Amino acid sequence: MPTSASASAVMSAYRATRNAQRKPVLARYEVLGYLSSGTYGRVYKAKELVANGSTTDARVFAIKKFKSDKNDDAQVLRGISQSIIREIALNRELHHENIVSLHEVLQEKTSIFLVFEYVDHDFLQIIHHHVFVLRKPIDGVVVKSLIWQLMHGIEYLHANWIMHRDLKPANILISNRGVVKIGDMGLARVYSNPLVPLYSNDMVVVTIWYRAPELLLGARHYTTGTVSYTHLTLPTICSV
């Protein structure tokens, strides 16, 4: 029977071989810029590198880099957190025109990277553009289209027993073609019927201004109401 020391040596050799065979992220993608950050990591805009290292006519992606644990200035990988596993698992199962799609998952040393399709804008940017630049409300026909597409994506999530739990303008992405994509499934959870109030068996999550009755109280309401209000009135909820 192998000893724990020999088993550890075998695993170390396996990890070394596996890591040597992996291409570094920067050998596969050229980072074009920083997009956003959150509790668990940062998101970057990147362009795919083709075989010769060129980015001509290459596809553009959004790469989410998860933060690793730090211990006295040394980064340590203490296994993959439950939230990361949940986000990866959910995104791999979701395939819908109004949900941001996951392209691939990469690991490099102590970091995990999720490579998503890139979407040009988020609704918070659209709000700011209309409030501070155009100084006029969003056209009613456009609002109807955005809300319809948003509801279409939500219907798909709920049909698969998934609750987003952090729906807000910054997580509603819009392409240059006007296609709405629901993004950031980091706080999403599979739920059951009947709906259980969030405080009964889970820590309270969701951006504070968008905490909805169905999450806090198990009520028959939905965050879409607050998001639709923002569509129609332009100010974000926190400024009301």
Predicted regions span which residues?
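Protein kinase glycine-rich loop
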Residues: 32-38, 43
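Glycine-rich ATP phosphate-binding loop
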Residues: 44-70
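Conserved N-lobe beta3->alphaC-helix segment of eukaryotic protein kinase catalytic domains
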Residues: 65-94
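Activation-segment/catalytic-loop signature of the eukaryotic protein kinase fold
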Residues: 105
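Conserved short submotifs of the Hanks-type protein kinase catalytic core
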Residues: 111-122
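Activation segment signature within eukaryotic-like protein kinase domains
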Residues: 146-147
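Conserved small/polar residues in nucleotide/adenosyl-binding loops
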Residues: 229-236
